[in-house]
């Protein structure tokens, strides 16, 4: 049996390593798919996409005003909520600015809330919106403007999950009907109001997203204002990192 010299063995090892490196460079591992969505959450106005259904705020939208005197609300006539001139339910009490709605931008007062979180507390020390469940049917577009290419709807709920009103627990399905992706994708996690970025988990989906997993970076943006919205709009930029 012919013996192989140490030099020949070392040369063979180097050749195999070089061949493996070249093969890897020619056929790199595929990167995880990344795509971008813009979600428009509109509370109040004539065409809302979100509505509180439980808690104090839900009662207001349903025409009931509990604890009116204690927290400063002016009782409507005959216990029935008074709509605006356009027939929509008001989101802000016009007399004292007490919030009638809360969403992903925090408690809403008269004017835009761009200076951080403003929280109205009840007599028990909890925010007025604590425990409020808001149902959403938000529009998803390919760009930040509401008139951008529509990609589908985000349907689900978010819940005011912190006593100080600083977080919302989100659970929704992005029903994508346009563009490259045409299936459903599920999201779950905590959205931090006033934070530059929050993270949501991707918890599966349907079709090509059946076994999807990953995460989404959620960043709040100020709407461009090219399309007039008479409610309170919260624009979210969602960057999705997927494995499936």
UniProtKB/Swiss-Prot annotation:
Main location: secreted
Domain of life per record: Eukaryota
Keywords: Apoplast, Secreted, Signal
Record's signal peptide: 1-25
GO cellular component, one term: apoplast
Subcellular location per the Swiss-Prot or TrEMBL entry: Secreted, Extracellular space, Apoplast
Keyword flag Metal-binding: no
Gene Ontology biological process terms from the UniProt entry: phenylpropanoid biosynthetic process
Subunit structure: Homodimer.
Family membership: Belongs to the plant dirigent protein family.
Classification via PANTHER family: DIRIGENT PROTEIN 18, DIRIGENT PROTEIN 24-RELATED
Chain's role: Dirigent proteins impart stereoselectivity on the phenoxy radical-coupling reaction, yielding optically active lignans from two molecules of coniferyl alcohol in the biosynthesis of lignans, flavonolignans, and alkaloids and thus plays a central role in plant secondary metabolism.
Stated name of the protein: Dirigent protein 18
Organism: Arabidopsis thaliana (Mouse-ear cress)
